[in-house]
Amino acid sequence: KSLYKPTISSMEGSKKGNNKFLLHNNLSEKGFPVFDTILASSLNDIPACIATLRNKGYKKAVVKSQIGASGIGITSLPTVPDGPISIPEHFFFEGPCMVQGWLDETVKNVRHMGSPSIQMFLDERTLSLYDITEQILNKDCVHEGNLSPPLYFSKNDWVFKELFRQATASGSWLHEQGYRGTASVDFLVVEHCGNIEVRVCEINARITGATYPSIIARHFLPHDAWLMRNIRFAKPLKDRSLLKILDQAG
């Protein structure tokens, strides 16, 4: 407002587009594979949700607020609690939370394959899917970078086609909410009982850590690979010091 410049997306479009619960419902209604999900209207509902997921064979569960980003509004819990369950009150600000089964090697016959993400841009008339990346995550699933392309499938594989099929559906839904701009769809790919399964985790209707490196790489190296890592220094560095280190390293 201070610059007297209009935004390309409405506030309502941004809010709806970042709502994980609305996206989950849309994908489920259209028959796409989704995570086992139970709604919790308050903290008192969480133990019963956790118990249900434990009976389904899950060792961990994740509690998601309807809107959140970069680790805000999401927390994981063991399905066998070792103490009282504590969830911040703001998790319920937008309405019921989603309590979902956590798919990884702790679940019988499941092997984690990867966490790909498809980058997209939405304008008034079109949805453009312009890159596919692999998220680099630490042991707590915190984002530490991206690489492209992912190493465990190629363009001719079923996984590649399924990722774009689900990304197209998710992006079309996002467009219907009125969102315009850059976005990405995050996925989980697992092997379950010998079959590969692809599920949408969430849509990030915003600029993400992969947006700029992806756009730059696709502009200058449209058919090549790229890698971006987030680095945190033990002591803060000034920009000149950082550039000097990079110059010295060649």
Give a label for each model feature.
Residues 1-48, 52:
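Conserved N-proximal alpha/beta basic substrate-recognition cap immediately N-terminal to
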Residues 212-224:
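A short alpha/beta connector and helix-capping loop motif
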Residues 34-37, 60-86, 140-154:
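Glycine-rich phosphate-binding loop of ATP-grasp-fold ATP-dependent ligases
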Residues 79-81, 121-127, 190-194:
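Short acidic-glycine loop/turn motifs at beta-strand connectors
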Residues 33-35, 56-62, 78-111, 173:
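Conserved ATP-binding module of the ATP-grasp superfamily
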Residues 93-94, 101-106, 142-197, 234-250:
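A long amphipathic alpha-helix within ATP-dependent nucleotide-binding catalytic cores
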Residues 137-138, 200-214:
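Glycine-rich phosphate/pyrophosphate-binding beta-alpha loops
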Residues 111-154:
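Membrane-embedded hairpin module used as a gating/binding unit in multi-pass transport
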